[in-house]
Amino acid sequence: MSGFAKLKSWLYKASLFVSLILLIGFSVVLPIDSIAQASKSENNAFNTFIVVGALVVFGVFCIFIIIGRMLFHKSCLKDIPRRYIPITPADLPHRSSREAVLQNMERSKELTILLKKPKDPVIHDGLEPPRRCDYPLDEKLFPEYLNYADCIKSLTDRLKYHGLFLNNLDVRMNLEDTFADVVNSQFVNHNANKIQLEKAKEFIDLYETIRFSGKDVTRDQFIKFVKFCLYFGEVSLTRDTSFANLHNFKLNGSSNNIGRTESEYSINPFDENEYAQDDMHYFPEPPTHLVRESSISTVARHVSSGVDLTNSEEHPLDTDSDCNALRLKLSKADSYRSVIRH
């Protein structure tokens, strides 16, 4: 604001103040004089009552007019649309104000175009970002809008309500044991592997930081947590003693021998009555671990009852073509009882 504009503003405010003082001073003289004249007359009480009553009525009438004007002004403002911008001289007589409004409108338009698409990917903690907001060079590992905290909480819920820790069902724990207690009992106690001990401590620290820090889980923390789960899942598989009982199976993945050898799981591998029993009869105890069922190594096959072994033994298999023909015949004769899953 220039010096001349400041001078004009100061003169306007000063003159307004002086005018208001004079108006109030002259207005007060009339009621004071009326009260003084009424008190000197013969009927002092009656005249005073008339003068004071007239002043009260005048005051109430003025207040009523002011309130009515305020309500009328408010109703007029309601008729104006909220998105209406006063840019015309009739709405906003002050020229500088109109120019400021127009300049801000142009600036808002430029900012809208500039900020419509962020310069860098916007990734918030706690949720997996959508593909359009992700870094182009990063591999998409998880579904969009995946809640990291819910996934981590499901691990403890499975441990708490189902007794399942990672992929091990045989978890010896008490009701008051925490996640850290289970990790210590599984991978820290009586363990001489320094790498596993270090990773187990990092696993516990990371879990407690995620669950009890009160902050959203970052993407790096969640990826690190998943890596720890996969690592200790593989460790628990290799340390599971129930795998030692499965070495007696002769799998047909890389051998021409179809069937099973004599073992503690079956007295006679070609006994049809034994095959009619439950599949879990072949195991000394139910398995206590989770395994993949998609690989060849998890399926053991035996000769189905639909194959004529007598005729096959009368003609020894001398050539590869005979072996292939028998293998094709066996594959067509398999039933659901000829598959043992573990």
Swiss-Prot record:
Q: Which family does it belong to?
A: Belongs to the DLT1 family.
* Localization of this protein: Membrane
What's the superkingdom here? Eukaryota
Q: Which GO terms describe its cellular component?
A: membrane
Query: Keyword set for this entry?
Result: Membrane, Transmembrane, Transmembrane helix
Keyword match Transport: no
Q: Which residues lie on this side of the membrane: Extracellular?
A: 37-47
Keyword Transport assigned to the entry: answer is no
Q: Which residues cross the membrane?
A: 16-36, 48-68
- Give the protein's biological function: Required for growth under high-pressure and low-temperature conditions.
Q: Which residues lie on this side of the membrane: Cytoplasmic?
A: 1-15, 69-342
- Predominant location: membrane
User: Can you say what this protein is called?
Assistant: Defect at low temperature protein 1
Instruction: Tell me what topology the record assigns in the membrane.
Output: Multi-pass membrane protein
